Amino acid sequence: MGNITAGSIDAPAVLPYTLAAEVNFQAFGVASTDYHNALYGYIEAEGWKNGYDAQQLKVPYIKLHRDGTTSNQQITETEKIRHIIHHPENRNNSYSEQELKDSIERMRNYIRTHNTI
């Protein structure tokens, strides 16, 4: 049988509430859509979204309109991932596991620099 060793997480939480998805990211490096959504929502709720977006590179995104037509847009990768998560009916876009993790890291870093928890 193997041994289980307890340790501590040195990275501080960035959200002002306990979230299992944040613990999983910090402890095990698990990038989840739940954590991405929570970080995105926190940035929006704090009124930081415009400032965050202004610092991010833009990527192509194909928007699906209600009438079934599409249009090309340039949005942040974070917003692209958010749209893909929230609009599964739009199958014109995709993201990788690495892109999800990178987006989470960018949001965590942004929150750290703007937060006073």
Regions found by a protein language model. Give the residues of each.
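C-terminal lobe/lid and adjacent interdomain/linker elements of RecA-like ASCE P-loop ATPase modules
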Residues: 1-67, 112
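Short, well-structured alpha-helical interface segments that form or flank functional binding sites
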Residues: 14, 18, 22, 73, ...
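A diffuse structural propensity rather than consistent per-protein peaks
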Residues: 19, 95-96
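Amphipathic alpha-helical interaction surfaces
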Residues: 29, 84, 88-91, 106-113
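Histidine-centered, metal-coordinating catalytic motifs and their short helical/loop contexts
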Residues: 70-94
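Amphipathic, Lys/Arg-enriched alpha-helical patches that create a basic surface
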Residues: 97-117
